[in-house]
C-alpha cells in the first residue's frame, strides 16, 4: 500500500476491533434459527464506508495466499457495494461518488464526507450549498453570523466549538472560503491555468476576509505563490468542474432571491433565514439544522471516536480533529504568520503567536 493511498484514506472511518471481526467473519456458522451459512443481516452491518476503506487498504500480506486474497477482496467489495440491496445504477453511483470525492481539494473532501452523501448528485448539492452560503458578502450582519454558526457546527466538533474566540471561528470559515474560491477560480481557467486576459474574473476576487496582505495576523493557508493577490488561477489538474448550461437553477429563495438547482439545497439554505433546527439531541435537547451535525454532536455523549490515526492509533470524534493531529506526523505547518514568516501546524498556536506581536506593538506605543 502506497503512502499516497494511506494519506487519502486516513481521514475515513477506521473500524473498531469489533467491526473488524464482523468484516472478517462475514458468514455466521449458525444463525439463531439454526440455519448454517447464513449471512449477517444487512441492517446489522457497520457503515458501508468501513468496508470501502478496508477494500481499498487491503494488502496481499493480509492473506495466506492469492486465492484467499481474491476471496477476501470480493467479500469486502460486496459488503461495500451491497449488490443484494442496490441496483446496478446505485452501485455505479457509489463508485462515481468515491472517485469524485477523491479528486476534490482536501478541505472539500472532509466537508463532503462529513455530510455522508449517498450518490454523486448529493455530493454536488453539498458543494453548491457551500458555495452559495459563502458567496454573498453583502448580506446583513445577523444573517452572516447565523451562516457562520452553521458552518462552524459542520467543521468542528461540539466540544471544540464551545468557547472558541471569534478569531478562531473566522479561521474555520476562511478555510472554507479558500476552497470555495478555488472552485470559482478553476471554473474560469484555460489550459494554462489563466483566464483569457491573464487575470482573475470578477467572480474570483480574493475574499476580503482572507486577504493576508490586508488583515494583520490572518492565516496563510498554503496557497501556491502564483495564486496570491488574485494574479492567476490555480494550475490545471487539481479540481475542475464546468457549468452545465442546460441545467437551470429553478429553486429560488423568497427571502434573498438566491437560486438553487436542487430543492434539497434550497431547504437547507432557508434554515439560515428561519433559524430552524429540526434535529434535536435526545440526551441534552440541543438542536441542529442538519442531521449530519446531530450525528457528530451525539459522539460527545456516546464517546464514539471513529476517526483513527493510522500512524499511532489515536482516535477522534471528528475528521477535523484527525486532520489536525496528523500534522504532528507529517510535519505540515500550513498556518503562517504574515509578519515574521514563522509557521505552525495548529491555528490556535498561530493566534497565540500573533498575540505576542500585538503585545510588542502595544509596548512600543507605551514607550513612545
Swiss-Prot record:
Record field: transmembrane: none
Subcellular location as annotated: Nucleus
Cross-link type Glycyl lysine isopeptide (Lys-Gly) (interchain with G-Cter in SUMO1), residue numbers: 27
Pfam families, alphabetized: SCAN, zf-C2H2
Crosslinked positions (Glycyl lysine isopeptide (Lys-Gly) (interchain with G-Cter in SUMO2)): 22, 27, 147, 177, 236, 277, 286, 361, 367
Described purpose of this protein according to its UniProt entry: Transcription factor required for myelination of differentiated oligodendrocytes. Required for the conversion of oligodendrocytes from the premyelinating to the myelinating state. In the developing central nervous system (CNS), involved in the maintenance in the progenitor stage by promoting the cell cycle. Specifically binds to the 5'-TCAT-3' DNA sequence. Has transcription repressor activity in vitro.
Protein's recorded name: Zinc finger protein 24
Lineage: Eukaryota, Metazoa, Chordata, Craniata, Vertebrata
